[in-house]
Curated annotation (Swiss-Prot):
One of its GO terms (biological process) is pyridoxal 5'-phosphate salvage. Pfam families: Phos_pyr_kin. This is Pyridoxal kinase PdxY. The lineage of its organism: Bacteria, Pseudomonadati, Pseudomonadota, Gammaproteobacteria, Pseudomonadales. Keywords: ATP-binding, Kinase, Magnesium, Nucleotide-binding, Transferase. Its cofactor is Mg(2+). Pyridoxal kinase involved in the salvage pathway of pyridoxal 5'-phosphate (PLP). Catalyzes the phosphorylation of pyridoxal to PLP. The gene is pdxY. Signal peptide: none annotated. It comes from Pseudomonas savastanoi pv. phaseolicola (strain 1448A / Race 6) (Pseudomonas syringae pv. phaseolicola (strain 1448A / Race 6)). Pathway: Cofactor metabolism; pyridoxal 5'-phosphate salvage; pyridoxal 5'-phosphate from pyridoxal: step 1/1.
Amino acid sequence: MKRTPHLLAIQSHVVFGHAGNSAAVFPMQRIGVNVWPLNTVQFSNHTQYKQWTGEVLAPQQIPALIEGIAAIGELGNCDAVLSGYLGSAAQGRAILTGVARIKAANPKALYLCDPVMGHPEKGCIVAPEVSDFLLQEAAAMADFMCPNQLELDSFSGRKPESLADCLAMARALLARGPKAVVVKHLDYPGKAADGFEMLLVTAEASWHLRRPLLAFPRQPVGVGDLTSGLFLSRILLGDDLVAAFEFTAAAVHEVLLETQACGSYELELVRAQDRIAHPRVKFDAVRL
């Protein structure tokens, strides 16, 4: 019997709705990954609503919880770490301490850093120290980085002028340490208005993927968290990078189709669960 992979997901959590771990955990489980959720914040709902309440996990609790897993002899079974939204650079450094501990227990363990800073339509939502930490420290340890366009712009200190420029910016991030960079949402002058575009960049090659852009009265939150989680999960399940990239684009599109059909603001993950596991659509990544 094939072993089920285990993934430590260090992200935010909302009681109502879907963002951070609340957007990623169930889909990752649904496609066959054992997820260990470590919630960096617990909020009533995501912060695009007019109000929310909740608490942030103290940074020192992150390595302490990981040591608790080590104490019961399970840390070596962790195949990957996924990190998302950071409340502070201190929280980020605590995560890197945990990643180092896990890689010591399992040298084959992977680390995907989703450098959450915001959304092109919503602006930056983190302090400058977090952006600096992600670029200067997290990128060096990450196997994979999955920025959106705003985050890639922040790392580059400029906006792109073309698709080729986006590719150059992703390659500059790749040079800081990751094995692969996935740009989850491209935005550049001349991009087709009816398309949603992504990039996958490695040292050897690059791929571009386009799918239809779906319209919503309010853009659902958690799409990036879902994207990063599914991409890492498919790699753990044996996909190569391009196959994981294509599967992720299709599965996320299926969720958005279901969400749109329901007229929902929150992602319809439960209703779309079979479409996540077995996407009906397929989008081909084109090598650049």
